[in-house]
Amino acid sequence: QRCKDCLYKLAIAVMNQWPGVRLRVTEAWDEDGHHPPGSLHYEGRAVDITTSDRDTKKYGLLAQLAVEAGFDWVHYESKYHVHCSVKA
């Protein structure tokens, strides 16, 4: 539930920051083993995100907005997405 609440706040922040752009979730809950053992994706507490326009120049600020939205851990994991997670 906390992850969902943070995503909701972040989606609003993204729309306010960049009109016409939306938050894009590329990975969330996972059951197919694409993440390392112990990944919070298996518990529904982690998401990988981008912007709908996939403008990588926005991802630094996207990460900052994710922190402000309440995510406990935010990591600009690759040039393709930002990883966010919440504590239990």
Curated annotation (Swiss-Prot):
Ca(2+) 2 binds at residues 27, 30, 32. GO terms for biological process: cell-cell signaling; proteolysis. It comes from the Eukaryota. One of its GO terms (molecular function) is metal ion binding. Keywords: Autocatalytic cleavage, Calcium, Cell membrane, Developmental protein, Hydrolase, Membrane, Metal-binding, Protease, Secreted, Zinc. The keyword Kinase does not apply. It is found in: Cell membrane; Secreted, Extracellular space. Pfam families: HH_signal (PF01085). Zn(2+) binds at residues 41, 48, 83. Ca(2+) 1 binds at residues 26-27. InterPro entries: Hedgehog, Hedgehog_sig/DD-Pept_Zn-bd_sf, Hedgehog_Signaling, Hedgehog_signalling_dom. The C-terminal domain displays an autoproteolysis activity and a cholesterol transferase activity. Both activities result in the cleavage of the full-length protein and covalent attachment of a cholesterol moiety to the C-terminal of the newly generated N-terminal fragment (N-product). This covalent modification appears to play an essential role in restricting the spatial distribution of the protein activity to the cell surface. The N-product is the active species in both local and long-range signaling, whereas the C-product has no signaling activity. Intercellular signal essential for a variety of patterning events during development. Belongs to the hedgehog family. The desert hedgehog protein N-product binds calcium and zinc ions; this stabilizes the protein fold and is essential for protein-protein interactions mediated by this domain. PANTHER family: HEDGEHOG, HEDGEHOG PROTEIN. This is Desert hedgehog protein. It comes from Danio rerio (Zebrafish). The lineage of its organism: Eukaryota, Metazoa, Chordata, Craniata, Vertebrata.
